[in-house]
Amino acid sequence: MSSDPRFDFFQQKKLGIVLAPFSGGQPKSGVENGPKYLMKQGLRSDIESLGWETTLEEPLKGRDFESGKNDETDVYGIMKRPNLVGEATKLIYESVKKVSNEGRLAVTLGGDHSIAIGTVAGVLDKYPNAGLLWIDAHADINTCSTTESGNIHGCPVSFLMGLDAKNTPPSLKWVPKCLDPKKIAYIGLRDVDAAERKILKDNGIASYSMYHVDRYGLNKVIEMALEKVAPNGDEPIMVSYDVDAIDPLYVPATGTPVRGGLTLREGLFLVERIAETGRLVALDVVECNPELASHDGHVVDTITTGCSIARCALGETLL
């Protein structure tokens, strides 16, 4: 491996790996094992081989969040497990905030995408002008009033923006209204609810679906997204990457796969381009679910891809 890209916001290449083995934002088991599989694949040593000094943060260690998924009283209206999600994401928030404020790049391994409530809020505490690239097949911007499933992994962006605040569960009222709609751009969308489409349009949020990738090419889409969330060209960048942005042909072991996604090469090129900006300050890799694989090869494909996303974002280059 070689590592050439610069990282302008860090005097030294120091990085905190935050493990977030949490599945309470959705009903399927197994996604809580994503971090363990990524680490077993050698991700930490891979990152260190790129010149990063790493520390390991485990904010959920010692807490039994999995048994809490069976608590049928943990509801608020249609919202499922808000107390569980609120507790877990607050711990993740404190951990990511600590890593960021110590001058380290935060790499958080999930876990379902509800953990981004904590990661994004933690990063924006340190870098309030950061632009957020949300790489996902889904918009994850349903509110407490629009969600049909009640699964909070489909709602993290709305909590971060403070949308529908009057209906926010008490356990999630700690979440700061920290995300400006002008500071987020989506790439890879292909499964968006009707209510979400309205939210995106009403808030003027930059949203690039697979149609835009096909029409303009991925490199142009990345450039357009960066111009939206970081118009000055020097702002920090955070990437929250749901592996289902990549087509299930390459990433089969994930909770809500949607055909017609990014190719594996496109999925890696995306973060390679972000690394080239020199402005990456945080990365999430979420929704790897080994239990949803139909055979061992699917586990290997998915976990290997998750590790590759992290390495490419952190500066791995071929030449």
Swiss-Prot record:
Coiled coil: none annotated. Mn(2+) 1 binds at H113, D136, D140, D242. Pathway: Nitrogen metabolism; urea cycle; L-ornithine and urea from L-arginine: step 1/1. Binds 2 manganese ions per subunit. The gene is CAR1. Keywords: Arginine metabolism, Hydrolase, Manganese, Metal-binding. Substrate binds at H138, A139, D140, I141, N142, S149, G150, N151, D193, T256, E287. It catalyses: L-arginine + H2O = urea + L-ornithine. Its cofactor is Mn(2+). InterPro entries: Arginase (IPR014033), Ureohydrolase (IPR006035), Ureohydrolase_dom_sf (IPR023696), Ureohydrolase_Mn_BS (IPR020855). Homotrimer. The keyword Metal-binding applies. GO terms for biological process: arginine catabolic process to ornithine; urea cycle. CDD domains: Arginase (cd09989). GO terms for molecular function: arginase activity; manganese ion binding. Gene3D superfamilies: Ureohydrolase domain (3.40.800.10). Its EC number is 3.5.3.1. Pfam families: Arginase (PF00491). This is Arginase. GO terms for cellular component: cytosol; nucleus. Mn(2+) 2 binds at D136, H138, D242, D244. The keyword NAD does not apply. Belongs to the arginase family.
